[in-house]
Design a protein with these regions (language model features):
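Flexible, charged surface loops at secondary-structure boundaries
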Residues: 1-2, 22-27, 51-52, 67-76, ...
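Short hydrophobic beta-strand segments
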Residues: 1-9, 31-34, 76-81, 152-153, ...
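Active-site and donor-binding regions of nucleotide-sugar-utilizing enzymes
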Residues: 5-132, 276-278
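Catalytic phosphate/metal-binding cores of nucleic-acid and nucleotide-processing enzymes, i.e., regions
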Residues: 20-23, 250-252, 259-260, 290-293
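Donor nucleotide-activated moiety binding/catalytic core segment of transferases
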Residues: 61-68, 232-281
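A nucleotide-sugar donor-handling region in carbohydrate enzymes
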Residues: 116, 120-197
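Conserved catalytic-core segment of nucleotide-activated headgroup transferases in glycan assembly
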Residues: 185, 194-233
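Catalytic binding pocket for nucleotide-activated donors in carbohydrate/polymer assembly enzymes
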Residues: 276-308
Length: 308
């Protein structure tokens, strides 16, 4: 039976695949959730119960399990976050999918990203057509982006399809908020905060002690200070002696921003070139304490200029 398969491993990816407008002749529309985030199985159960957009909703603990599924259940069109994968290249050669689109997850979609694999893996990538440049795999049909015009400006010779999402990011965020509150856990306390001065630190893969020191020095400015941990962080002992609360939620932080701003809270966001802040630059105090990052700054400036 013909099917289109949408695979996502984070709530933001699920948010984005719901915003894809794709006309298809496939009889099935299958959503695959990979359990790489907090309370992922609970999220999957809620999606399965409440989101009737899909013919089938599946859950896998690992990409290996998904690869086994795709091998035995070929797709007409595959939607994924990244194309630099020799597994996808092999599967395309074996006709496990006919077309493939990657979709934006954040500002990284606009970066000149290279896969620096060496040796045998690099040779396999080249043989399978995955290549070494994100968005340029030989088997890739195209990309879904929020700012395709920016992408064309950055990469004028790009030859594959560039498609827009159904709705602009901020508009879609408003539309999806009620449903995501039903899907998510641990956000309840944010519904009651009103008129507060709140600091939020969005971590990268590691907790930055210098940012914690900044929060410590500025603690009198805030009624509350929160830390939103990167999903890969398991150890939180570095936060033990600091005046912060860990956000114990799997909800997209962008939805928390909306909730808090709508209730009249003043937000100061500390981060290191985070995608999450890029759409809110004119609505919060933006404290980017990361190292200079020209590609990020260019994308952020483009989006900020469009929202002024």
């Amino acid at each position: 039976m013909s099917r289109d398969v949408y695979v996502c491993s984070k709530p933001l990816q699920y948010f984005n695949v719901r915003n894809i407008d794709y006309e298809s002749t496939a009889r099935e529309k299958v959503l695959v959730i990979i359990g790489f985030f907090r309370d992922a199985h609970s999220f999957f159960e809620k999606v399965k119960q409440l989101d009737d957009s899909w013919t089938e909703v599946l859950y896998f603990d690992s990409m290996f399990q998904f690869d086994r599924y795709l091998f035995t259940h070929p797709a007409e069109t595959l939607f994924a976050e990244i194309d630099v994968s020799f597994i996808y290249g092999i599967f395309h050669k074996l006709s496990r999918f006919k077309r493939m689109y990657v979709f934006e997850e954040g500002f990284g979609a606009y970066r000149n990203r290279m896969d620096d694999s060496k040796g045998l893996k690099r040779k396999i990538n080249q043989w399978t057509g995955a290549g070494d440049h994100v968005g340029y795999a030989k088997f890739l049909t195209g990309q879904y982006l929020y700012k395709p015009d920016l992408y064309r400006q950055l990469y004028p010779d790009y030859a594959k399809e560039l498609r827009s999402f159904r709705r602009p990011f901020m508009e879609r965020l408003r539309e999806e908020l009620p449903m995501f509150l039903n899907f998510s856990t641990g956000h309840e306390e944010f519904l009651t905060l009103r008129g507060k001065s709140i600091g939020i630190y969005i971590t990268n893969h590691e907790i930055n002690e210098k940012i914690l020191a900044t929060l410590e020095a500025e603690r009198e400015r805030f009624d509350l200070i929160y830390v939103k941990l990167h999903p890969h962080i398991q150890e939180t002992i570095a936060l033990k002696d600091h005046p912060v609360k860990i956000i114990q939620s799997n909800i997209m932080v962008e939805f928390l921003f909306i909730l808090l701003l709508d209730n009249g809270n003043k937000l100061t966001i500390f981060h290191e070139s985070s995608t999450s802040i890029i759409w809110f630059q004119n609505l919060v105090e933006n404290r980017n304490l990361g190292k200079p990052f020209e590609e990020y700054d260019g994308v952020a400036a483009y989006i900020q200029s469009e929202t002024l």
